[in-house]
Amino acid sequence: MTAQNIDGTLISQTVRSEVAARVKARVAAGLRAPGLAVVLVGEDPASQVYVGSKRRACEEVGFVSKSFDLPASTSEEELLALIDELNNDNEIDGILVQLPLPAGIDTTHVLERIHPEKDVDGFHPYNVGRLAQRIPKLRSCTPKGIITLLDRYNIELRGKHAVVVGASNIVGRPMTLELLLAGCTTTTCHRFTKDLESHVRQADVVVVAVGKPNFIPGEWIKKGAVVVDVGINRLDSGKLVGDVEYDKARESASFITPVPGGVGPMTVASLIENTMLACEQFHTEQ
């Protein structure tokens, strides 16, 4: 068997079109368009690329996008003061602070300062806690995007054994919670996991987010498994590859996300959905 590719570019465009229609309906009803504040500290080239794509996506769906590009010398106090200002701005529904932050700024302090109802990245402990208690509101963007992909492809998760490789706060941990919520029996693997291969070989669904090119050999993938590759790594040749050995894995898998064009576009689509949700649920009276 050869796996069917899960087309994240196509699904993300569908999600954006759905949000754009909701924005249009809001504006036609005399309500303001949703507003997203995007904060970038420093001049990290990769962060500038990510922020640019997020701002463009906002404008495409009709959001009001406010940009705050701060120098790398910005202090934590100055950044927290800006977040306080944005928390109190009634025309801002979502606040996104691009990570990583420069040395000297405590990321936890910054993320916890964002009001939970404006935390459209889904990183605030309150929102992660809601997901853990099975009452999610604003959900972490990449895991949410993955669940959307699987749902749009009608991939049944209930009763499946899902293995998540990687336990970061941004992907691995919230992904485990999302899969639990979807009815999976979940295993989370990390750097202390013994015999990673045996876990991956048992997986009906495997989600890999470690940031190491071709980290999971394709031969580990069980026949008929669903493979979600969150990694995006550039080889010396310039080629972009994921964390899973794609060509070999697709010989066994039933579905697989390609890199690029799989999970990546869905992260931004989820951010757009979260901002729309925050506007509709929390700030409708404005």
Curated annotation (Swiss-Prot):
InterPro entries (alphabetical): Aminoacid_DH-like_N_sf, NAD(P)-bd_dom_sf, THF_DH/CycHdrlase, THF_DH/CycHdrlase_cat_dom, THF_DH/CycHdrlase_CS, THF_DH/CycHdrlase_NAD-bd_dom
Subunit structure of this chain's protein: Homodimer.
The protein's annotated pathway: One-carbon metabolism; tetrahydrofolate interconversion
E.C. number: 1.5.1.5, 3.5.4.9
UniProt protein name: Bifunctional protein FolD
Assigned protein family: Belongs to the tetrahydrofolate dehydrogenase/cyclohydrolase family.
Pfam families: THF_DHG_CYH, THF_DHG_CYH_C
Any one biological process term the GO annotation gives: methionine biosynthetic process
